[in-house]
Amino acid sequence: MDFFEDNNPFSGSDNRSASSAVNVEPKVEPSQHQGSSSVKENAISQPNESFQSRNMFFQKDVDSVVDSALDPNGIVITGAMKAESGSHIVYIIKLQDSEIHHRYSEFASLRVQLSRLYPTCLVPPLPDKHKIMDYLINVTKNQRMSRMLEERKRLLQLFLRRVAQHPILGLSEVFRKFLSRHVSWKEVLHSPPISCLPKDLLKAPPADPSSKENAELYKELPIPSKTLVPRDNYDDVGKNFLMLEDTLQQYSIVAQEESNLFNQIVLSNSKYCLAHSTLGAMFNALSLSESGKLLTALEKVGQANDHTCLASIDFMHNFVIAVIEPLQELSKDAKNMRHIFIFRKMKFIQQVMVEELLTRKKSFLHLLERRERHAARLQQAIGEVDGDVILNRESEATLGVNNAQTSRSTIPEEDPLFNDEESKEPSVPLMGTDQPLENYHDGNGEQTEECLRDLRHNQSQDFETVSQDTSLTSVTVLPRTIRDVFDRIRFVLNGLTDNNVEVSRHNNIGRTAESVTHLTDMLLITTKDVAFVTDRVNFEFQRYQDTHRQDLNRILNRLTDSHIDWANRNLRIWNSVQESLKTYVS
């Protein structure tokens, strides 16, 4: 956090008198402010005491701070001082009988962590690290640093008091540890609940972002976009929040512009003060050359100009504290409240996204189930058709056997091999012993095989002749070769994967059903979160409105009081001058 570091106003100056003008208190020993607690610390620092007892004492001190009710008015920042190690500035916080030292970067870190721990709570703003007004006014570096430290002490004290007044932030364990002198802030940052916070608050329960309950479901929640859902698709509550968000944005801009205008008034008054200071010096110089009543009158006019200058300086100081700084606080509060509305909008969009995902998954699951039923009906119908085909094939096979037997009995009369000429040959007698009949069948088989061989040889010769005559042989063979290669690759890939269509379909249905169950649980938690965030935002906005009315009323009253006081002071001075002039004229 280097960008939070403080600039040390004492690092570039060795002038003791100048540094003493910065209202920086000297370092005070803890024994001067802690009363009876110093006895405990001396007992703890004894070398014979164990480390365990020391830790028990520290934990007891932390628990007492956490359990005790904080008085917001009891939190006071008494001063600023240079840190023992380093060149940064630490601010001294006095709470009851203890003192705590924290630097500006730790205040900024506290605010960031409170915003993360309580995303639906309005965390008070911090003063700006640097302001342009500090450099526009022609003052020295020490005067600028003195003014900056005074302003920071005042606004940091206001920040702590506002946090303590909050009904939720004031009871935060992190805030109580920040106000404990025995707890290191670095240890707090690296310990629960801060160490358990996720990177994105949209993936955590808004009631307790550090909770691990339903952590797996929250991790899988989608991250929405601000413009994902059109304005017309919001419900009445969402449209009301959108209107309030736009109103707060405009109000923040207007409050910032008013603050800038008041800063211009301060600059004009600074010139006005300088002019009256110059006039006072000139009238005082003129009075030196006069005497009598004229001398008195000139001195009165010069003193009136000097008093006008002083009254204007006091007016500007009160004006900055009572008007400009509260207006800047109001502008920052409006921005922070708008961010809370944006957080609620993002949670609502997240719920809409989960609903859409669940609807698509349910539709896809219904489609898969319908396909599964259709496939089951087809499989049943195919089974019935296969049964009929098997019966028909069995009947045809039975008829084929009977026909074969019948044809086999009539072969001697119909077979062309048994022609008239061969039947008359004496070497193949139709009747006689078995040996001539076996020789006949052997001869007939050899003739049939020889005919088949001649037929195959002729077909192969015809195919080779056609292949040699055509000119598209390479074109027809190459695609078949490539197709064979891809068929083999596809066969290997199908062997590596689950190529069972039925099993794949069942697995897909199972995965989709599991996703539907998962999304249903996510929808339940997002719906619950949106309801919680809506209630908390309504409560916080109501509290913001009440505080805003009080602050704005106080600003207007202080503004009028400052003008009236400035005018009354000037009126008294110039009335006395008028009386002196009447005496001189008479």
Swiss-Prot record:
Provide the membrane topology annotation.
Peripheral membrane protein
Q: Where is the composition biased (Polar residues)?
A: 8-22, 31-46, 401-410
**What SMART domains does the annotation carry?**
PX
**What Gene3D superfamilies does this protein map onto?**
Arfaptin homology (AH) domain/BAR domain, Phox-like domain
Q: Which UniProt keywords apply?
A: Autophagy, Cytoplasm, Endosome, Lipid-binding, Meiosis, Membrane, Phosphoprotein, Protein transport, Transport
**Chief localisation class:** cytoplasm
Intracellular or extracellular location(s): Cytoplasm; Endosome membrane; Endomembrane system
Q: Does the keyword Mitochondrion apply?
A: no
* Alphabetized GO MF terms: phosphatidylinositol-3-phosphate binding
Q: Does the keyword Membrane apply?
A: yes
Q: Where is the composition biased (Acidic residues)?
A: 412-423
Binding annotation for a 1,2-diacyl-sn-glycero-3-phospho-(1D-myo-inositol-3-phosphate): 103, 105, 129, 152
Which Pfam families does the protein's record reference?
Answer: PX
Q: What's a GO biological-process term for it?
A: meiotic cell cycle
- Function of the protein: May be required for cytoplasm to vacuole transport (Cvt) and pexophagy. Has a role in meiosis.
Extract the PANTHER family matched here: SORTING NEXIN-41
Q: What is this protein called?
A: Sorting nexin-41
Native source organism of the sequence: Schizosaccharomyces pombe (strain 972 / ATCC 24843) (Fission yeast)
